[in-house]
């Protein structure tokens, strides 16, 4: 759900920044827009799909792949937060015609900053539980093997 929200926010920013008029001070094109930062929501969607699949069909390889995609989501989120903070800390002059669009774009970045934190906490929590589940499954397999070897 959060990933779909990020994709819609990217589309909103695309429409918003495409409507800018070239003025004396130029247009506002933040670094998060240039890098397609909100398009990285695709990683969050993929992580959700993997999570649902592992919940229905828990296999070791599924848990490992979900753990890997969640780690990718964590790295993506940290990168997105860093780029958004850099964007929000610097505001160059723009044409007065584009000021409203730039201001609205910065507000969208602030909203996304909150959702990046939410996605980070979800991915981190699920990664921790995946690691503990893998460790527990490995211990269960070891104990079953030891029991089989100890019976004559």
Swiss-Prot record:
Any Gene Ontology CC annotation: plasma membrane
Q: Write out the GO biological process terms.
A: cell surface receptor signaling pathway
Q: Which organism is it from?
A: Homo sapiens (Human)
Where in or outside the cell?
A: Membrane
This protein's membrane topology, according to the annotation, is: Multi-pass membrane protein
| The family this protein is said to belong to | Belongs to the MS4A family.
Transmembrane feature ranges: 1-21, 32-52, 66-86, 111-131
Classification lineage: Eukaryota, Metazoa, Chordata, Craniata, Vertebrata
Give the protein's recorded name.
Answer: Membrane-spanning 4-domains subfamily A member 13
Claim: Acetylation is one of the keywords in the record: no
Protein keywords: Membrane, Transmembrane, Transmembrane helix
């Amino acid at each position: 759900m959060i990933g779909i929200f990020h994709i819609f926010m990217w589309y909103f920013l695309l429409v918003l920044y495409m409507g800018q008029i070239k003025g004396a001070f130029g247009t506002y094109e933040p670094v998060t827009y240039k890098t397609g930062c909100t398009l990285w929501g695709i990683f969050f969607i993929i992580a959700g799909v993997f999570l649902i699949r592992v919940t229905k069909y828990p296999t070791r390889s599924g848990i490992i792949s979900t753990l890997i995609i969640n780690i990718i989501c964590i790295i993506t989120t940290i990168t997105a937060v860093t780029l958004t903070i850099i964007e929000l800390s610097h505001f160059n002059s723009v044409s007065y015609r584009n000021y409203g669009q730039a201001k609205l774009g910065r507000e969208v970045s602030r909203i996304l900053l909150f959702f990046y934190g939410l996605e980070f906490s979800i991915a981190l929590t699920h990664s921790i539980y995946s690691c503990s589940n893998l460790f527990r499954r490995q211990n269960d397999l070891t104990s079953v093997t030891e029991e089989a070897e100890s019976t004559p």
